[in-house]
Amino acid sequence: MLRVRCLRGGSRGAEALHYIGSRLGRTVTGWVQRTFQSTQAATASSGNSCAADDKATDPLPKDCPVSSYNEWDPLEEVIVGRAENACVPPFTVEVKANTYEKYWPFYQKYGGHYFPKDHLKKAVAEIEEMCNILKMEGVTVRRPDPIDWSVKYKTPDFESTGLYGAMPRDILIVVGNEIIEAPMAWRARFFEYRAYRSIIKDYFRRGAKWTTAPKPTMADELYDQDYPIYSVEDRHKLAAQGKFVTTEFEPCFDAADFIRAGRDIFAQRSQVTNYMGIEWMRKHLAPDYRVHIISFKDPNPMHIDATFNIIGPGLVLSNPDRPCHQIDLFKKAGWTIVTPPIPVIPDDHPLWMSSKWLSMNVLMLDEKRVMVDANEVPIQKMFEKLGISTIKISIRNANSLGGGFHCWTCDVRRRGTLQSYFD
């Protein structure tokens, strides 16, 4: 049975960390192993500190606009992205490593230019409808500023055009009353934070914490310029060996490679998130939160929420095509593992930046309500069997830009408290 403990002082949950960390430590070496060891040591030492306990249990300001600890508490405020002016990223090595071969000619032809006009128009309409429905469900909706992403920019290390302000989940993560800007890893996303600054400054003035992770230079050394990509089999072998297009030259991560479950936050090493980036998050959030690395049989890992999506206390959707190597740890902790059905999105529908498994990239409005694609009947039935009501919207054209409901949003405020689901 899943055990849930509200954090009101006392134990810091070192036992739970030992349970997860010790087992994960057996499957990893080098940097990853040292990360878990240092996390365990930091947590254990904090258990003897009254000051640390006080810090962890300080109440948030009652009027703080930012407060979210997990993926399922009742949603009160959310940022929803924009498809307007979205541009195809230049076909650089990091973009090639994250996209399917059949779309490479598309990137080579249109890189630096807007996505197809008619497609963007449909995507914009879909997201507007999504915003309207969220408002009807009682959720406050914020939108990023519109920006012309076709403008070329240059740093001392590279030049590029932009991408979009469509996926706030990729760049922002809320932990408690703190909103963290991720540094990103694609050169086309270097200045993506600009679309969200007016919103974040407003939250900051109203009492939220605001942190920007160290911005990488994105110099050539951050990328394996000779990353060998010839087939899915090659990618499987490379991922199994812990080899990705991003190196450990400097910290980089996308916020969407982290998923929250109260005190415990799970992260994956991916094509856009390196161990240095995960280590930065671990150090930044310790001792109040515990960051754990998990991995999957995934030839092209990029963002965790279409592979492993936590939808309730002790309840997770686990992609059958990308099984989690550490899934037994969750089972032993009393979690329920749900395997979502195969997506029904047609083969000829363009998915320039993602896979069909966006069907499981859902947004929980609370434990009993989920926003799901209107076309994905099999997963709707799955949720209904779980006793979860479905709010159906079609965002197929918006999917083409690389995200489902979870990707298109960043939940800023959920009504709930910090709890531990592994103690």
From Swiss-Prot:
Which residues does the Swiss-Prot or TrEMBL record annotate as the active site? 254, 303, 407
UniProt entry tagged with the keyword Nucleotide-binding: no
Give one GO biological process term: muscle atrophy
Q: Which residues bind arginine?
A: 170, 305, 322, 354-355
**What is this protein identified as?**
Glycine amidinotransferase, mitochondrial
What's the source species' lineage? Answer: Eukaryota, Metazoa, Chordata, Craniata, Vertebrata
Give the organism the record lists: Sus scrofa
Which family is this sequence assigned to? Belongs to the amidinotransferase family.
A GO cellular component annotation here is: mitochondrial intermembrane space
Q: Does the keyword tRNA processing apply?
A: no
